[in-house]
Amino acid sequence: MFAKSSRLLLPIIVPAVLIGTLFGLCTPAHADDAHPDGSVPPAGANDWTCRPSAAHPQPVVLVHGTWGNQNSWDVLAPQLKAQGYCVFSLSYGRAISSMRGAQPGVYGTADMRNSAREIARFVDEVRAATGTPKVDIVAHSQGGPLVRQFMRFDGGANQQNPADNKVDHLVTIAATNHGTTAEGLGFLLPTGSAQAPILGVIARYLGTAAAQQLIDSEFLRSLNAGGDTEPGVKYTVIASRLDRVVTPPETTFLKAGIGATVDNVWVQDLCPDDEFDHGALPESPTVGYFVQKALDPAYSGPACQG
């Protein structure tokens, strides 16, 4: 039980500790990229003349995570392109209203409901350019629940007629599908109306999206209220036991609903020595293997590094 003085300090202590923890754990966009501001797609992405082949009939859309941009895919995008995929990426969720979001090259800080609508528009652009009714999506961290928001609320999936879905396969990498406890600190948040001021402080420093990914946030309650999945969509959910951002790591896993298939996988079950942290997981050879195997079950490339 907190003493009265401690309870009075909670509105100051809790956001300060959460901000420090989340800031320390999350990995920003690569400072050594040729275009760290996210304005230029990674090699292999956004060839708008690309037409999908019979071997890979769906274009692949890459969706980065919080504080990242499309350069998060500078390893995976050229790998997928080399395998014959049409690959597309974007930088979404730019919002300079927060201290973190005002920094150059930092995206994925805006309200996730607005960012989901950005994803919806981009997917429609890709479908129109490639002449395909559906896309496959690979999403990291925030990108996972963001795409699920797009599918559920912004036209990405049709529960009444799954044949009209715009997404065939969603592959997530360390996604905050059910939120994060920020290594347990999220449980310190008060409930009800007392939570709003604290989340407001977090949003001003780290961005609205950071607050929305804390466990039991209003955004996640709304997203997950109707179940984790959409009929007709295939899901591959990739998790690392060493993840210190999505905590506990298994909260990323999804439960298949009617008409959906879900494959929840641990990186370390395939490659026990894989120690890539949360922000670097899109560069992990193990993750790359899981992604390519999910998109094409016939893929037989190397899995583990070394």
Regions inferred by a protein language model and the residue ranges of each:
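Short aromatic-enriched loop/helix-cap "lid" or pocket-rim segments at secondary-structure transitions
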Residues: 99-102, 179-186, 247-251, 276
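Hydrophobic/aromatic beta-strand patches that form the interior of the parallel beta-sheet core
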Residues: 61, 88, 171, 236-238, ...
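Extracellular/periplasmic catalytic domains that process cell-envelope and extracellular macromolecules
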Residues: 52-56, 80-82, 129-130, 138-139, ...
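Serine-dependent carboxylesterase/thioesterase catalytic core
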Residues: 64, 87, 105, 115-223
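Secretory targeting and sorting signals
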Residues: 1-31
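Solvent-exposed, acidic/flexible segments
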Residues: 56, 66-73, 108-116, 140, ...
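Active-site catalytic motif of lipid deacylating hydrolases and related acyltransferases
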Residues: 33-39, 46, 53-134, 192
